């Protein structure tokens, strides 16, 4: 997720299991552990310049870097792989790979054996990290946010991104698609307007998406392509910044420019709120769609002017779950919620004020 910088933050990303997050900044890069919140390391401006994008590979020593901001050292058309395990104090010695294109890189995704690089109208997939070679490239409709998601599971190599048709999703099984071919990916007609946010659950069995309208989140089975459930964020349009599943796919959270993080139940959807009209009986088709939607089980607010990413924390007990929100204004929010919809703040911090003297 990227936004105009507040306090120098240009983008934020969780790692693949949401146990860490990385922060691209005007002053370099910072890496944080989520629970407990602590800085794990940083790359300063002298080493990397101002950064536009950073992507982690789990909790490993590898980072993908894309230059950006007001004083970049690296180009916005290149992805550089930083290996902190490499000996040497010179930053050049730690830059072990470079992927260069003719247009700006909008996002990067990594898994243990592949790296995905997203441009405005094209997606590239390479083997990674040893002896990288291009495996696939896919043309897309205009994708200015660089939307895509990559399943981290060892069992499923699923890639999802906006399809050619407005509001559609394309799913590609990278394990069964032959490298060098342009076999047609599976398509899901998810929305009527352009896709604004997309996310896979950890095993890659469910994909969630929202359109630019931002009122509905729809979930689909990645195998059958059938719609599983429709979740209603609200009635007024909003820009969704982030959608994430809990580790066991029992819950889903979503953040938007309304300054609200919504939490939905997926395993037991009876926990979600329903429209009062649902008890009225038969209604017309347009109202019927509204009535059938499920509203969030719980929600909490963060500063509305500050974009944020959200994810689920570690469970503290069987009936208590938590959601973490990381905002570009430098704030960290942790809320706990129960199945009956109670939601309370458990922790607040300013992660930009947490410093560690060690480099990454």
From Swiss-Prot:
Changing residue 109 to A: No effect on interaction with ATG2A. One of its GO terms (molecular function) is protein-macromolecule adaptor activity. One of its GO terms (biological process) is protein localization to phagophore assembly site. WD repeats lie at residues 1-34, 40-84, 92-128, 133-174, 183-222, 227-266, 284-329. Keywords: Autophagy, Cytoplasm, Disease variant, Lipid-binding, Neurodegeneration, Repeat, WD repeat. GO terms for cellular component: cytosol; phagophore assembly site; phagophore assembly site membrane. Its main location: other. Gene3D superfamilies: YVTN repeat-like/Quinoprotein amine dehydrogenase. Activated upon amino-acid starvation. Changing residue 17 to A: Decreased interaction with ATG2A. Loss of interaction with ATG2A. Ubiquitously expressed, with high expression in skeletal muscle and heart. Weakly expressed in liver and placenta. Expression is down-regulated in pancreatic and in kidney tumors. Pfam families: PROPPIN (PF21032). It is found in: Preautophagosomal structure; Cytoplasm. The L/FRRG motif is required for recruitment to PtdIns3P. Interacts with WIPI1. Interacts with WIPI2. Interacts with ATG2A and ATG2B. Interacts with ULK1. May interact with the PRKAA1, PRKAA2, PRKAB1 and PRKAG1 subunits of the AMPK kinase. May interact with NUDC. It is linked to Neurodegeneration with brain iron accumulation 5: A neurodegenerative disorder associated with iron accumulation in the brain, primarily in the basal ganglia. NBIA5 is characterized by global developmental delay in early childhood that is essentially static, with slow motor and cognitive gains until adolescence or early adulthood. In young adulthood, affected individuals develop progressive dystonia, parkinsonism, extrapyramidal signs, and dementia resulting in severe disability. Belongs to the WD repeat PROPPIN family. Component of the autophagy machinery that controls the major intracellular degradation process by which cytoplasmic materials are packaged into autophagosomes and delivered to lysosomes for degradation. Binds phosphatidylinositol 3-phosphate (PtdIns3P). Activated by the STK11/AMPK signaling pathway upon starvation, WDR45 is involved in autophagosome assembly downstream of WIPI2, regulating the size of forming autophagosomes. This is WD repeat domain phosphoinositide-interacting protein 4. It comes from Homo sapiens.
